[in-house]
Amino acid sequence: MTDSLSLDHFSMLDVDQAPESPGLYAWYVSFRAGPHDWKIKPSADGDQAIEGFLNLLRKYAGYYEPLPIDLSGRGSYGAKWEGSLELDFPLREPTEGAQTSDDDSLQRLDTLMDSLDTEERRRVMATILQKASPVFSTPLYIGVATNLRERLRKHRLDYTRAHDWLRDHPEDTEAIRARGKSFGQRAAARSIAMEHLEAWVIDLADEENDEVTKKHLRNTAESAEWLLHRLYSPILGRQ
């Protein structure tokens, strides 16, 4: 038995290179920005790159936005109460008629805007966020597989089919975002680019021996998956 498990990572574009062995895996989305995003874009209204970079942050934050929670209850005389609660999620695009955020949130937004005020500050912000995944970030999805390559390929196929469907049927986006049956479908519905998705895998092939059979490995991996779901609450998990 080895002293340490094998850990590796693959872009969704490259999952054909994943090992054909049992293991655990987690999907992450990386933040992508380049000089064209942080360099100054002069205009009559000032530097357009500030708003452009803020929109880039909003899009990235939106990948992690939880779905609304449905609530229901009963009152006196059989009255029924129903509704949903949405998290006051940071950086959400303001909508007309929406309630104004509290003073603390507005102050934090002002501080954020100051950190995007110059080309160099935007570059530093981009570098921090690019380095943060996966070290500081919560996974989008955690899974267990008997054959890692086969499972990751299935995720890619689900993503591709959902992406192609939504291109022609954009009206189905919210339904798939909320009730998509697979990680690939839900990721496509959140408009996450395939090339931004990366799977980190724990390969258990070297752990198999006379005392730890493939069945034992699967059971152990499933127990670890159950625990990791409850610790990290991956936003695109089965829940």
How should each PLM-predicted stretch be described?
Residues M1-Q239:
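Boundary/linker segments flanking structured domains
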